Amino acid sequence: MGRHAHPELTMHTISLAEYMKPIESGAGWKPVAELMLRSAETLKRAGADFLICPDNTIHEALPFVLPRSPLPWLHIAEEVGKEAKRRGFRKLGITGTKFLVSGPVYPEKLEQMGIAYLRPTREQQEQVNTIIFDELVRGQQTPESLFYFEQVIESFKIQGCDAVVLGCTELPLLVNENESPLPALDSTRTLARAALQHALAG
């Protein structure tokens, strides 16, 4: 594409509050899938060719979405796995909301690709989740939270991880690759690059 050119983009965003209701209540992922399908139908009518979702956590609903989706999706964990392979990483530490890191989104894709992974401890999952929802989503960043998160990454390093997945859109606000004890895979940026490549190829 030429100067100032880029693929057409259309976005449809349902309030995070609507997604969090079934997730936090334990109602399961089917209600989340219905919200995603609502967006998918809207974007198809707008002329989209394929879909992406930068929210790592709600990818757990994709198995309920894909059989009924009017358009194909790029999977964020699969794209992160591809990037890890490209960069030669063999064992990844997974960070994100407690719903993500305790779930199957990354393990399923990474296992299929032959990449080892490590989850944070239960205590670390809870504390990082608190940092995300009580601070980062509100635009707040504290030195104490940065120190804690760096210690989580350091624990991955001690246990043999050679990179860490920033599996939440807000986590790059807290730490970047220059500050991280391990190379950091920014899942949102990785998905964005994959989407651009997919659009240009199509």
Model region roles, listed by residue range:
Residues 1-202:
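Non-catalytic structural scaffold of enzyme domains
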